[in-house]
């Protein structure tokens, strides 16, 4: 099947793109075209106008500042994967990027495109949820910021309005001091090019990395493809906060996660399997993040 006929637009600035969105209510945005082309070819979307933002200036960058990390919406997955500056301060993000499909997709697919698609299996959606990111979006009327925990509304539905363009995603570094924070992304895929069966992001900050049993000051645990939207398990996080990590605590967290996730059954993974996988990934990811917070190797 081929896409239905449409009129193609290729703006060069964000202002031009938002003006087109304001003038063309039926228009859809195209970024790296790694998913949208498939959707169009199967006629799951038949817009009269397609706005290709791949040539829009100023949307492809990774800016690691003293207080904030900002990633432009048109930044390729490969850019994130190979960013040494990003790996030093938020290693969770490039670690997840390297597990997105294969090199061809990573060299074309974009961070903003993944977030805008809002597939619950998306790696970036999972990691950025754990990091309390916020998204900057723009329209012809101005810009606004959306906290990521308010961004995903339902399956493949976001808080971005039809006339808005995702500009960037930002993460405050305040909660993640490099010297005592560990991060881990864990994923299972049937093959390199497939979506994750399930993914997990863990972030752990300890009080004293040199102590025999460091106490966890802050913990984050989120999942990909474990519900209709990317899922963060706050109850599991609360269980480990204020305690040194132990095998007993990990088992308790695993039980909490098993009950908290709401996975959809798939051909190759039923609901029970995904629940068990989420519980296993919770243990594994938290344990590794805890070790990394102490400067220990896996």
Identify the meaning behind each predicted range:
Residues 1-298:
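C-terminal structural segment of proteins
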